[in-house]
């Protein structure tokens, strides 16, 4: 406003002077007479045109030397108008067009980004019979590099060899740059290695080529060879590229060495280098160092602010990112579209609609709404803030709806749990890329539509140009793990290996979890052991795999190994270790781990950790100690804590304490069906049928229903699901016959049905029949009649397996010499020759 005020208060005399100013006569005279010396003084296209008119009047428009210089000077200006004028002059004098004239035009068009025109001029020169020189080829290759015209560049390389310029340093540097920019790094390296002489441009082109692709390690290695072995002094471009390579590698140690080299070598640090250093430190999680650099060089640099803000967003430090944005505004730095992307993304992650609207207002006021990526970010923000109507208004106004735009809509629906709407949008997309497929597959998995996710993945295989990546396979592996389908799990692992998908720590961790959930702990641990870079999540997955397999001792060994390797366990890792102790009955070790959380590792126990301890103590029969732990909690115990106690009371048969725990649950979570079911189980086991009936009546009055028990089994790639009491399976007569056979043979070996699992006051015969229709027994019988002798039977149940079915499975495994692997909602049961891995402790 101050500047505007100064303009408004100019005196009339000043206004008159400023509005009547005419072009300087001195400038006019410098370009009026057409001489080579006056051409140098022409600074604008109008002056060049004036010079050309003067040249024509003087009859010098046929002077090759002067016309060539006019074309060159016009190209140097680099505007579309000056290039068109240069080409017009060139066209009128083409009969005596020179190599220098062509070089000027090719270079001018390439430098201005008009690369296709530059390439056409190069080809036109070749066809005109004018021989190129050592400058022509680099200018042509520059155009090919910028436009990624790989075919044209390769043809130019052929001409270079044919015409004897292959050993020229300037030409060789251009070839290295061209191949590197086009991603042909092997070809670039071949030219580089064959060079008899290399300068800083040669090394920088190769290093930057590696750094911009997925060969950051090669970029770093080549840099140190350059400065140590060859003693070539790098320039600022070299330094920016090698610093960015360290950032990609997240290699703080090497990044520090590069920064030390900069300080010791006396290389002048410019803004781009500082931005690259900040980016590197942020990506290496050295946030404090990045912040010191940022503060040292000030907040007045736009690129530096953008580097800081975008990395804050990437780290999830969204409030800090917005702080940088506010600092820019206070410092008078005008945010650009990159700044706005970080700001909008921060609002999106925070789900802060007020700040998001403020960013949207800034976008509209500053004309950024024409940028597709800005609109895509706004759509994402509004969808995450549950403002779908606003998101769709932006979507409808966009004239250029890219695949990224559509992906934002699909992702927004997935984020809001609207899987059907996401699917409908996905189906109508005019174009789909791998992100589209990954988004919808992930949405289906999040919606527990696991089989549908796998079907979509199979459909994706027929799409030309769409190849699964690590993100795809993580979703599919997760779906497979939830289904417990081991054959599918093995195929997924084979698919990853066959298609060369990189097994990084995230995908590897997902595969460990997948095989663990599918009852194959050996494969899970094999993948874990193959990972070269294991983070806390990978170790936690391995600990969980051993815990689910009933190998509590090995799970604790892994937990200790992780700590010995210098990794700090997080809350999730402690859950895995405590769960292992609970499943294995390791009370003392569980206590030691629990009390070490805050004391040794600085991790405050949360509800879930107390729940694990209550479960551990309760299973061991230490109910009074479990209650004391609950009473000593620093926070109010939630319904999950009390449910752990209730489950323990059922195992121990403590009716009074079970009723107390159930009462607490019904206050905290009155809709929780499981607590009513558990309490009714306790009453039924104690023969207190009236109390059980009251619980059931209370459930009915509140509209609560026990979820039906379902068990699934895969036979020859097809999933068969059974529900307790359901007799609709087409093989039901054969299943019933097998159940009768197993029951008789198990009875001869001493199996007695556990009638306490029937929660109805009916006669003994009816109870036995009801037990025979439990879903896991139906699945087990179908497995026995449908699979080959000696093969493993794998069953997945949605609820906890009852004691009668557990006992029944042990007898069946012994009678038929089968391994039965039963996964319930709590753990795995590996049953062999009448014995279970859980030791009847579950």
Swiss-Prot record:
One of its GO terms (molecular function) is zinc ion binding. Pfam families: DYW_deaminase, E_motif, Eplus_motif, PPR, PPR_2. InterPro entries: DYW_dom, E_motif, Eplus_motif, Pentatricopeptide_rpt, PPR_At4g14850-like_plant, TPR-like_helical_dom_sf. PPR repeats lie at residues 98-132, 133-167, 168-202, 203-234, 235-269, 270-300, 301-335, 336-370, 371-401, 402-436, 437-463, 469-503, 504-534, 535-569, 570-605, 606-636. Keywords: Repeat. Residues 717-747 are annotated as: Type E(+) motif. Residues 748-842 are annotated as: Type DYW motif. The keyword Magnesium does not apply. The keyword Repeat applies. SUPFAM superfamilies: TPR-like. GO terms for biological process: RNA modification. Residues 641-716 are annotated as: Type E motif. Belongs to the PPR family. PCMP-H subfamily. PANTHER family: PENTATRICOPEPTIDE REPEAT-CONTAINING PROTEIN, PENTATRICOPEPTIDE REPEAT-CONTAINING PROTEIN ELI1, CHLOROPLASTIC-LIKE ISOFORM X2. This is Pentatricopeptide repeat-containing protein At3g22690.
């Amino acid at each position: 406003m101050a500047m505007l005020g100064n303009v408004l208060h100019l005196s009339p005399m000043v206004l008159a002077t400023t509005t009547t100013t005419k072009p300087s006569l001195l400038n006019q005279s410098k370009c009026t007479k057409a001489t080579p010396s006056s051409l140098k003084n022409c600074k604008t296209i109008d002056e060049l045109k004036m010079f050309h008119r003067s040249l024509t009047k003087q009859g010098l428009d046929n002077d090759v030397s002067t016309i060539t210089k006019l074309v060159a000077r016009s190209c140097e200006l680099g505007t579309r108008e000056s290039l068109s004028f240069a080409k017009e002059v060139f066209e009128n004098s083409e009969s005596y067009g020179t190599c220098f004239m062509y070089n000027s035009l090719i270079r001018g068009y390439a430098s201005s980004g008009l690369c296709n025109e530059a390439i056409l001029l190069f080809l036109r020169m070749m066809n005109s019979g004018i021989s190129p020189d050592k400058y022509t080829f680099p200018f042509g290759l520059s155009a090919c590099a910028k436009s990624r015209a790989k075919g044209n560049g390769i043809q130019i390389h052929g001409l270079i060899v044919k015409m004897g310029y292959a050993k020229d340093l300037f030409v060789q540097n251009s070839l290295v740059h061209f191949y590197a920019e086009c991603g042909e790094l092997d070809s670039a390296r071949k030219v580089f290695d064959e060079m008899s002489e290399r300068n800083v441009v040669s090394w920088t082109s190769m290093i930057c080529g590696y750094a911009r692709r997925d060969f950051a390690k090669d970029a770093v290695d080549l840099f140190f060879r350059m400065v140590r072995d060859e003693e070539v002094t790098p320039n600022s471009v070299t330094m920016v590229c090698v610093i960015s390579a360290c950032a990609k590698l997240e290699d703080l140690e090497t990044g520090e060495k590069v920064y030390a080299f900069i300080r010791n070598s006396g290389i002048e640090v410019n803004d781009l280098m500082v931005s690259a250093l900040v980016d590197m430190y942020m990506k290496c999680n050295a946030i404090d160092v990045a912040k010191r650099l940022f503060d040292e060089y000030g907040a007045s640099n736009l690129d530096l602010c953008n580097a800081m803000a975008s990395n804050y967003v990437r780290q999830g430090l969204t409030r800090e990112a917005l702080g940088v944005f506010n600092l820019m505004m206070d410092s008078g730095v005008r945010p650009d579209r990159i700044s706005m992307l970080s700001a909008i993304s921060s609002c999106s992650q925070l789900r802060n609609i007020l700040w998001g609207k403020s960013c949207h207002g800034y976008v509209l006021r500053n004309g950024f709404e024409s940028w597709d990526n800005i609109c895509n970010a706004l759509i994402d923000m509004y969808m995450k803030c549950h403002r779908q109507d606003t998101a769709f208004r932006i979507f409808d106004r966009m004239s250029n709806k890219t695949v990224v735009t559509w992906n934002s809509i699909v992702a927004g629906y997935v984020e809001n749990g609207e899987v059907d709407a996401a699917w409908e949008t996905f189906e109508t997309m005019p174009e789909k890329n791998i992100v589209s497929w990954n988004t919808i597959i992930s949405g289906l998995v999040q919606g527990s539509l696991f089989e549908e996710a796998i079907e979509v993945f199979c459909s994706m295989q027929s799409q030309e140009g769409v190849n699964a990546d690590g993100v795809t396979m993580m979703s599919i592996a997760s779906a497979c793990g939830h289904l417990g389908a081991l054959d599918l799990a093995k195929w997924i692992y084979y698919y990853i290996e066959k298609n060369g998908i990189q097994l990084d720590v995230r995908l590897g961790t997902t595969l460990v979890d997948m095989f663990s959930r599918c009852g194959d702990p050996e494969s899970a641990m094999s993948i874990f052991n193959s990972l070269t870079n294991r983070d806390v999540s990978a170790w936690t997955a391995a600990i969980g795999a051993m815990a689910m397999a009933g190998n509590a001792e090995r799970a604790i060994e892994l937990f200790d190994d992780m700590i010995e390797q210098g990794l700090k366990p997080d809350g999730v890792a402690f859950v895995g270790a405590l769960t292992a102790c609970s499943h294995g009955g390791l009370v003392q070790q569980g206590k030691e781990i629990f009390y070490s959380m805050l004391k040794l590792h600085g991790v405050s126990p949360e509800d879930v950790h107390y729940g694990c301890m209550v479960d551990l103590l309760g299973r061991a029969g230490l109910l009074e100690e479990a209650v004391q732990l609950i009473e000593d909690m620093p926070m109010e115990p939630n319904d999950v804590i009390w449910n752990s106690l209730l489950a323990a009371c059922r195992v121990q048969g403590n009716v009074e304490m079970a009723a107390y725990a159930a009462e607490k649950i019904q206050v905290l979570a009155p809709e929780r069906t499981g607590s009513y079911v558990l309490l009714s189980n306790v009453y039924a086991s104690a023969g207190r049928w009236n109390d059980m009936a009251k619980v059931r009546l209370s459930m009915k009055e509140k509209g609560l229903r026990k979820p039906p028990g379902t068990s699934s089994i895969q036979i020859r790639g097809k999933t068969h699901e059974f529900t307790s009491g359901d007799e609709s399976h087409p093989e039901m007569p054969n299943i019933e016959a097998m159940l009768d056979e197993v029951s008789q043979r198990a009875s001869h070996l001493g199996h007695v049905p556990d009638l306490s699992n029937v929660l109805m006051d009916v006669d003994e015969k009816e109870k036995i029949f009801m037990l025979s229709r439990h879903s896991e027994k139906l699945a087990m019988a179908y497995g026995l009649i449908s699979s080959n002798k000696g093969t493993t039977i794998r069953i997945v149940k949605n609820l906890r397996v009852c004691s009668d079915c557990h006992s029944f499975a042990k007898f069946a495994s012994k009678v038929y010499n089968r391994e039965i692997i039963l996964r319930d909602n709590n753990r795995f049961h590996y049953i062999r020759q009448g014995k279970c891995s859980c030791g009847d402790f579950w």
